[in-house]
């Protein structure tokens, strides 16, 4: 599962 938390690239 690929997700991003605003200022955290992921």
Swiss-Prot record:
It is found in: Secreted. Keywords: Amidation, Hormone, Pyrrolidone carboxylic acid, Secreted. InterPro entries: GnRH. GO terms for cellular component: extracellular region. The modification Pyrrolidone carboxylic acid is found at residue 1. Stimulates the secretion of gonadotropins; it stimulates the secretion of both luteinizing and follicle-stimulating hormones. Belongs to the GnRH family. This is Gonadoliberin-3. It comes from Oncorhynchus keta (Chum salmon). The gene is gnrh3.
């Amino acid at each position: 599962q690929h997700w991003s938390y605003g200022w955290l690239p992921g």
